[in-house]
Amino acid sequence: MAAKFVVVLAACVALSHSAMVRRDAPAGGNAFEEMEKHAKEFQKTFSEQFNSLVNSKNTQDFNKALKDGSDSVLQQLSAFSSSLQGAISDANGKAKEALEQARQNVEKTAEELRKAHPDVEKEANAFKDKLQAAVQTTVQESQKLAKEVASNMEETNKKLAPKIKQAYDDFVKHAEEVQKKLHEAATKQ
């Protein structure tokens, strides 16, 4: 999930930056600027709330929610990787290379999370760090992707923008659900 978020965020950043490159670019760039702004705020809020939840007194409930959340994050990372694969077939040049690199990094992040997954209850702190690192990696990949895609804005905007926006929206919705479940488990009396 975190890797998906990063890739989507990077794509959004790239699209919003590329919209600024040309003065005659369509006004549609504003949607990507809003998406980029939202992604930055979401990442900050997610990290802050996640860190505060780790100090929960309901350790058993929180660890279970963390394990369940990681299951759904892994599913979202797979879905995000599939979305990127679909976008790759519509892209060309540097945009295609950037999408492929982002997809590979998302899959690598998912694999690292998958390896840590069985030990969630035993090592919740280390797993928390891996989950947060996955979010950070995804954001960094999204920023790289955004820079690459920006150079091919017109074509990218027509073909990839709807796919990237949908993937981003799906990721954020899912991440908010996981965050809510973790919060409920941590504050359970």
UniProtKB/Swiss-Prot annotation:
Gene3D superfamilies according to UniProt: Apolipoprotein
The species this protein was found in: Manduca sexta
Family: Belongs to the insect apolipophorin-3 family.
UniProt-recorded name of the protein: Apolipophorin-3
Cleaved signal peptide residues: 1-18
GO cellular component: extracellular region
This protein's UniProt keywords: Cleavage on pair of basic residues, Lipid transport, Repeat, Secreted, Signal, Transport
Claim: Kinase is one of the keywords in the record: no
Propeptide: 19-23
GO terms of molecular function: lipid binding
CDD domains, per database record: ApoLp-III_like (cd13769)
Quaternary structure annotation from Swiss-Prot or TrEMBL: Equilibrium between a soluble monomer and a bound lipoprotein form. Apolipophorin-3 associates with lipophorin during lipid loading until each particle contains 9 or 14 molecules of apolipophorin-3.
